[in-house]
Regions:
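Residue(s) in the substrate-gating loop at a strand-loop-helix junction
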Residues: 72
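Substrate-binding pocket helix/loop in short-chain dehydrogenase/reductase
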Residues: 22-23, 30-32
Length: 176
């Protein structure tokens, strides 16, 4: 991409896997999959992109670069049967704030967007009671569309250089 466009100004880390269930008797391979995608994927992508973002922040026309990490409301509020998913999203939030403090003086803005329920395939990887729980939530709530999240990202990365959105919650209006 850098060869094609010449620079990297914005990184959006938006990969995620949500496998729900009780901790007792859990399939630890599912935990490893979630940690690999939700945490390690974000870390490795950020590590690869950061030198390019730091360079872009020094140059015209924007003189700023952005990292937006997509987390979840599950990175702020824990629920039964969400344990490892909660762990990964709390981790994303902590990493985001730490990185923000490291690179903000170098004009790389780092923020986290924490959506509530969104119409994606995220819940489809579950089965049984957990799938029923997710389906019931979707049926009872007017959940967000992907465009709502894209609009939030656009808002974060189009602020003037002097303004940084460190955290943005985007929730369905009727999600408690």
């Amino acid at each position: 991409m850098i060869d094609q466009f010449g620079r990297l100004d914005v990184l959006v880390n938006n990969a995620g896997l949500m496998l729900l269930g009780p901790i007792v008797g859990a399939d630890v391979e599912e935990w490893e999959r979630m940690l690999s995608i939700n945490v390690q994927g974000l870390l490795y992508t950020t590590n690869a992109a950061l030198p390019h973002l730091l360079k872009a922040a020094e140059d015209d026309p924007r003189q700023v670069a952005d990292i937006v990490n997509i987390s979840s409301i599950a990175g702020r509020v824990a629920w039964a049967n969400y344990g490892v998913y909660n762990l990964t999203k709390f981790g994303v939030n902590g990493f985001t704030e730490s990185l923000r403090q490291e690179v903000t003086k170098r004009r790389v803005r780092v923020g986290v967007l924490e959506p509530g329920g969104v119409a994606t395939e995220l819940g489809t990887h579950n089965s049984g009671a957990m799938r029923e729980h997710i389906d019931a939530f979707v049926e009872s709530t007017e959940i967000l569309e992907a465009q709502d999240i894209a609009d939030g990202i656009a808002f974060m990365v189009t602020r003037p250089r002097r303004a940084s959105i460190a955290e943005l919650w985007v929730m369905p209006t009727d999600q408690a």
